């Protein structure tokens, strides 16, 4: 596996436990959208892992949240510009807990990770397969606010001439007058959001030819602005009339999926978590009602 190889060569320095507990790793970015340009050697790899049990459940090591010494919990590991074999890698691997939280918030970059085409998956164990198979559980209409916000920020960056000092983008800006990759991302985010709102699913390569043409500079900046203004109105309509996904995340269902994934990795969690049974919940609700009438 790539992480093992790079760690053994001391080219990357993840936590020692991470390579053996990696659940999912995928190629993200332009390659996963089918919009990468010829000759590009950079590869963005992102995914999630399952940290040690005491990191997810700190009470198992005697830690009481808010009292005394608190151990720093693992959130994510990132390393960039790792060169090997003619390629340059950027890594970002999240704790499964952080990953679930960001996915539940419909963070665009995180949702993309579990929606890449199968040929972009570099590593996937049974936990990773479970999460990918249930990716639609994370989708909700809140994607409208998240994706639109990201797209608007990208468009604002284009208009203020961002990335002119970036040597990798300078040629594109010089040739077209703006950062074509930024405009591609504006359109990608809008089209992904529209897919989720209308279909309840996400196919990253659906619009690959269109996105590639935008990245090549086949659209003027004025045409791009007009496209975004029109699509923003379409998104408002799709959000208002959305029926393909729930309005809000189903936190209980997502938490249940997280617990299923953790049990798949750790085994029995009865010593770590006590889940209330339906009968216990009913009895507790009855007790609350009766307590209102007790003298």
Where do the model's predicted regions map?
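N-terminal regions immediately upstream of nucleotidyltransferase
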Residues: 1-11, 17, 294-295
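Structured mid-to-C-terminal alpha-helical surface segments
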Residues: 9, 137, 144, 148-161, ...
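Active-site nucleotide-donor binding segment shared across nucleotidyl transfer reactions
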Residues: 11-60
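Short, low-complexity, polar/charged sequence segments that are solvent-exposed and flexible
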Residues: 43-47, 64-68, 121
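Short, His- and charge-rich active-site/binding loops that engage polyanionic ligands
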Residues: 52, 60-71
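Phosphate/oxyanion-binding loops and surfaces in catalytic or ligand/nucleic-acid-binding neighborhoods
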Residues: 52, 106, 196
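Short, solvent-exposed secondary-structure capping/transition elements
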Residues: 55-59, 112, 195-203
